[in-house]
Amino acid sequence: MGSSFQQYYWMNFLLLLVFILIPHASCCFSSIFSFGDSLADTGNLKISSPNETIHFFFPPYAEYLGLPLVRPYLESQKSIQNFEGGVNFAVAGATALDATFLEEMGDSNPRTNNSLGIQMDWFKEILPYFCNISSNCSEFLSGSLILMGEIGGNDYNDALLGGKSIEQVQEYVPLVIEEIGLSINELIELGAATLLVPGNVPIGCLPIYLTNYEGSDKSDYDPSTGCLNWLNKFVEYYNEQLQTELNRIRSLHPHVNIIYADYYNAMMYLYHSPEQFGFIGGTPKACCGGGGTYNYNSSAQCGMRQASACQNPEEFISWDGIHFTEAAYKWITNALLKGNYTDPCISSLCVSTL
């Protein structure tokens, strides 16, 4: 997922996952390699767009805590020392499908053309920094954790927000699933043995969509959450297809740990009872925005001069109408690592002390 280059950045999901996972998983994984979009980007978009102003809203917690950083691939000094803890290939705005194909389909994505295929090329380019022969690489990757996504959300976002119908966007699902499956298979063939693969989030609860489709029929909304049912049903369909593909890959590679991360149901649990967890800021309004029913305005997005941020972001689920707040990311991270939102349960690996 992605938004304006001018937005403030938040503590993203990957950083929180690493903060909580590494102290428990350091005995199992020597490195983390991450692919995806803005839910995992730790700097690649900023590096690839040096003339754009991107503000960082939170301090460098990982450095302060002494935790290994999963550094962005596009850092200029590529060496094994700089990438000791792994590499992050994720780029905000990235898609699963190739940018050229999406342009041919009439979808415009001005943020980045760094699709999953390009991120995979980066991975293969840097792999020799860690190992130099196939047997070496297989051994190295078997001790690494691969985070595959979330990726694919922007393929749907760009199409839906560009005016395509849900029926047209649904035709993208098998293509996105195929691209993710091909990448997973390629990583396994190179030696990967543990992969965490998230599904998509409930986009029907995001202020950007609630604003875009504001005025929809009352029956289109879930009365208990205020979310758009038809958009969330689409995400449910996509996530089901993704899990079917993961099951197919598991049957081909029974020795590999492929963990599905259920972002959708973890977030829906939060949306159904926000006050119970301290989110009293008026769900599903955004904390930072330019006004309107859901505090999202495409002409005054978070970070633009006309927008302003709330004083209590810890009480909001949505940060900028597109992404979640640090508090929400922390909640979902804990839910994934300590709850029932991964299949198989992530604690069934060596993370025994969670």
Features from the language model and the residues they span:
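Conserved active-site regions of diverse hydrolases
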Residues: 2-354
